[in-house]
């Protein structure tokens, strides 16, 4: 089971349970996440939902890279994966109950987009948040390009999404990215505090307040997400994606300058970069599976 679901005392808890890959998102996990949030929405005994991950390393690190490698040879299959991701994000964002993100570890790429889909976010003080799309070959358009500027402002959103530097929890709190940051030992108590406060509210008015607050999020999402899915599908087998995946697997930096220069010519970028054997394999097809999944999962956008 990749997603655990419990209900107790009016609170539903949805927990991503793939710690071996830093709670990364594959299709079965996305389907389970969607279904559990729909279940919580329809359950009148539930007044608040907590979304979290197993372990202390990661809340969620976005797309499962083993699945993403397969799209190099079958880029049209990415459309189906992204559809599952969209459904999951919409189930979280559109939940009829307030959703509290309990950030037990790093939130990276699509993992941060799950965080952004929640209503409130509480993080342990050793957590980092990050997007790496332009660094590693993925467009961060599953919520980040749509919503980051609403939380932290346009300039800071550009800093996060273009520079791809890790942001410490306290800095994220100062920017308005998070609601509360506490020592790890106090994380559950802080989440409990929010949940108890939310349970002492009228359910219909709370739901309507969420809908009204989501106006700008819904507007930017509905105007961009379908085109983002098409763009990501068309480019799922591209040189940049292949090089990003290969550099992850081989634990080496991308030669961005050589990549940029080669893409300005009429030759395939891979020939100009002179990749290693492993990188060339990634460009020509899915690279071999890695036994070091946690490392490859640490930074990747949806």
Give residue ranges: language-model regions.
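Terminal peptide-recognition signature
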Residues: 14, 18, 33, 51, ...
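Short alpha-helical scaffolding segments that buttress acidic/His motifs in well-ordered protein cores
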Residues: 160-164, 209-212, 232, 248
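C-terminal long alpha-helix characteristic of the crotonase
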Residues: 19, 122-127, 178-226, 234-239, ...
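Conserved CoA-thioester-binding segment of acyl-CoA-metabolizing enzymes
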Residues: 1-52, 90, 269-283, 296-302
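Glycine- (often His-adjacent) and acidic-residue-rich active-site loop
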Residues: 53-91, 107, 135-137, 220
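Crotonase-fold acyl-CoA enzyme core
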Residues: 3, 90-204, 238, 242-246, ...
């Amino acid at each position: 089971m990749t997603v655990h679901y419990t209900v107790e005392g009016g609170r539903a808890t949805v927990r991503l349970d793939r710690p071996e890959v830093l709670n990364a998102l594959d299709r079965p996990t996305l389907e389970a996440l969607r279904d559990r949030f729909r279940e919580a929405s329809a359950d009148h005994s539930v007044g608040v939902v907590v979304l979290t991950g197993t372990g202390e390393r990661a809340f969620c690190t976005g797309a499962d890279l083993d699945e993403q490698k397969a799209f190099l040879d079958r880029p049209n299959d990415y459309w189906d994966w992204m559809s599952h991701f969209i459904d999951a994000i919409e189930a979280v964002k559109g939940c009829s109950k307030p959703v509290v993100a309990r950030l037990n570890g790093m939130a990276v790429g699509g993992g941060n987009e799950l965080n952004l889909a929640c209503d409130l976010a509480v993080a342990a003080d050793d957590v980092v948040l990050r997007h790496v799309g332009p660094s590693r070959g993925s467009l961060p358009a599953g919520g980040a390009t749509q919503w980051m500027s609403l939380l932290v402002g346009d300039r800071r959103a550009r800093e996060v999404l273009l520079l791809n530097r890790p942001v410490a929890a306290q800095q994220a709190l100062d920017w308005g990215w998070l609601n509360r940051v506490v020592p790890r030992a106090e994380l559950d108590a802080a989440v409990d505090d929010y949940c108890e406060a939310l349970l002492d509210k009228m359910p219909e008015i709370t739901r309507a307040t969420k809908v009204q607050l989501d106006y700008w999020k819904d507007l930017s999402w509905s105007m961009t997400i379908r085109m983002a899915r098409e763009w990501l599908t068309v480019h799922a087998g591209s040189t940049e994606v292949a090089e990003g995946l290969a550099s992850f697997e081989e634990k080496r930096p991308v030669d961005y300058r050589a990549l940029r220069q080669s893409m300005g010519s009429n030759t395939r970028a891979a020939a100009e970069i002179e990749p290693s054997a492993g990188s060339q394999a990634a460009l020509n097809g899915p690279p071999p599976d890695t036994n070091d999944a946690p490392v490859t999962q640490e930074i990747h956008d949806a």
